[in-house]
Every structure is written in C-alpha cells, then in structure tokens.
C-alpha cells in the first residue's frame, strides 16, 4: 500500500502542506469529502475533522478513507460518533494511515481504536508507532515447523493442544469460566514463555470490558503499583461505538502484538473477543459504502477482510502470535457465513461446557467437543496421541452408560463397565486444575503442569495403578503425585473423624 509522504520545508509547518477537503455528505458513520484536484488522499489514509458544533463544543473526529469516488471525492468511515458534523466542515488529510503506539509502554494500559489511552492514567510513554494496516509476513519469513504451544493447562495440552502461532476458537456461553481461562493463559504465557498478551475487545459489552480489567488487576495480571510489570495490553472498541471503530479495533490490537513479535522477538498471545463482531461491523458499513450485499446480508468482501486479519496472525522466525478468538455463533447456525469463514482459519477449538461447570469442574473445557489439528501422532508423538485417544474413549463410554446408570443404577453394569465408569470419573476430576488467577477466590495455590507430567498422570489412571484411590483425590490437583498425596491426607482425615 502506498503512503502519502509529507515533506517539510524550512519555515513551513507540515500541517499547512497537508491537503484540506470539505464534507459533502454525511450518512451515519460514512462521510463523502471533496478535495482540491491532485490532492486526493490514498486509500486507508487517516483524515481528521477538527471544528466546533452549534453548541460551541470541540469536535475531533478521525476517519479512514475507504473509496475514491471520482470527481475529487472520497468516501471515509468515521472512527467515532459523527454527531455535530455538518456539510462544509474542513477535513485534513494526515498523509498516513491510522498509527497506534507500540512497545512495552502499552502493557497494563487500555486503548481505543486510535491508540489513545482511555484509562485516565495519562499519556503513553513511547514514541514508537506502527500503522494498523500492514502486510502479512512474507512466506520466506514464516516458521513452518509445527510445534505445540504448551499452556500448562492439562485438559488443553492433552486433548486439544494449541499450535505455536496458531488460531484457536473459544466457544462458551456466559458464566462458564471463559474470562478465568483467558486470564490463566495470559498468566501462564508470561511465566513459562516470557511472553506478553494483547486483548482486543471487539464489540463487546462495556461492563464485560470493565469487569475483565478489574479482575486482571485483582489477580495481578495487571500490576497497578508497577505498571511496567503488567503482562497484557488492552484495546477496546465496545458495542456502543460506531461500526468504524469496531471494524478496526482488531487491527489495532494485532498491530501492538506484531511489535512484540517482530521487534522484541517474543511469543505473544492475542485475544479477540468477539471475532463475529468484527464481521458484523464490516457488514454495517458495507451497504453505506455502496456495496451489493452477499449471502445473509453480509459484505461481499467478507472472506478478504477476514483473511487480511487472520494472515497476519502467524509464527515467524523471530517470534509468534498465537491467537485465541471467542466465536459467537448466531442462532447456533454453524453454516452462517460469519462463523463458517472463521472456522476455515482455526487450528483448534476449545469448547466450554455448562454441564461441567455445574459439576464444579474447572476449567470447564469439554474433552469430547474440543478439537485440534495438532493431535496427530506425527506431530505430538505416539505416546501423547494414544493417551489422548484412550482418555476420549473412556469418557465417551462413560457418557453412553450414563442413561443406563440413571435408570438401573451402577450395580446392573458389567464388571468391565463399572471399572470404566470409575476410571472415567477419576479422569473427569483430574482434568480439573487450580488456577493461579483464581487463588484470590479459591484459596488454593495455582498449578502449572508440564505436558510430560500430564501424559504420565493419565497413563497411570488408565493403566489401573490408581484404582484404589478415591475419586475426590483427583479433584483440583496439579500433577498425579499430588493426587496420591491428597488420597493419603483424605484417609488420615477420615480416621481422625472416626
């Protein structure tokens, strides 16, 4: 993409050289602007409207050029509300695309789509900025090696492992522990990989964004006393904002993540909540830009817009961006163009189950519904693959037997099936784990469990070596040795009670 360089001559301010246009037409968030001949801005250039409204209030609206209409007119989408704008107002072409602050100074802070801090903690202490529209890494720069991204969370690492530099879809309703899982991943990547995280709130509720910020401060993911030691940068474009902001806030978050990957050479975790809202915002402005709607009223450029975002999320030889994207499925229709286009880019899916959450098993990741393209013998090795398959088989058999148990009871099952049920219940409880970020609420210290320890633990349960231990011993522990210790403690407690 070409940029419009602004040259500076001695004694002449750069603002005077920038071309100035005037607003011709305003339709919601879309503006038509006329510029002098030969002074047209480039596609994606940022335009600024600075003026005063009829009540003499300051107006400062940033727009992004989307189309060149001919006759020296351009069509732009506003990044904030267009209230108070009038035809004839002056519009300044900045000569560059929207650029946002990047680097360590962004950690612990909250930004809007323009990269302006909105947390009342003063300006950001950095001079480094990146444009939000950047090319995806060249093919030669990509790291093609398939490697597992260890999270330290047993159920994820064993049954639906994440790919380093991959894209993961997070499916879950309200109140099943999505926020806590997100915060634990942010915490673990910082501790185990020395990495940082960027959270992009795309079209989410303002209340949820505020709750997440407060919980992050409470759990230590954001360090209030020493903000530089925080592990995450937050970028919000909430539901109440115009579609222009919601359409671009994902790119703002991604740009901040790219700096950590390309310049700081770090492993970065990028959260996008919700990727559906990114598509929805594009669909809102598409008709106003004069495009013919496609299937189900979505924009005809849906695949291109999704691809331009997703292709930038990848591993290079310098570092990686691993992305976890919350996916809303409208009316539970997986064939809807928005989720269907998203699925094409995902390497793994993590499904949170309300049934498990109601049993008190956290993280409430459904072991049978969650999937990963990485769970193949040639990638994870035979030992990991076979253990995962046997765990799934045991849980699947338990699921099939539950109706029989509910009607006839456990005693009517064969000896083999009773053993399967006992082991499945132990596996189900062993898939739970105390989280570091939940220490504040539970009082139990968090546990990071390495992949080798996870595999060993499930192998011991499947082999029958631990059939003698009570199933409570496997609930909310880290590795398998802790389960054995907990069993001894439970036995001693029961003796004391007697």
Curated annotation (Swiss-Prot):
CDD domains: ATP-synt_F1_beta_C, ATP-synt_F1_beta_N, F1-ATPase_beta_CD. Disulfide bonds: none annotated. It catalyses: ATP + H2O + 4 H(+)(in) = ADP + phosphate + 5 H(+)(out). GO terms for biological process: proton motive force-driven mitochondrial ATP synthesis. Gene3D superfamilies: 2.40.10.170, Bovine Mitochondrial F1-atpase, Atp Synthase Beta Chain, Chain D, domain 3 (1.10.1140.10), P-loop containing nucleotide triphosphate hydrolases (3.40.50.300). PROSITE patterns: ATPASE_ALPHA_BETA. One of its GO terms (cellular component) is proton-transporting ATP synthase complex. It is a peripheral membrane protein. Keywords: ATP synthesis, ATP-binding, CF(1), Chloroplast, Hydrogen ion transport, Ion transport, Membrane, Nucleotide-binding, Plastid, Thylakoid, Translocase, Transport. It is an enzyme of class 7 (translocase). ATP binds at residues 172-179. GO terms for molecular function: ATP binding; ATP hydrolysis activity; proton-transporting ATP synthase activity, rotational mechanism. Belongs to the ATPase alpha/beta chains family. This is ATP synthase subunit beta, chloroplastic. The gene is atpB.
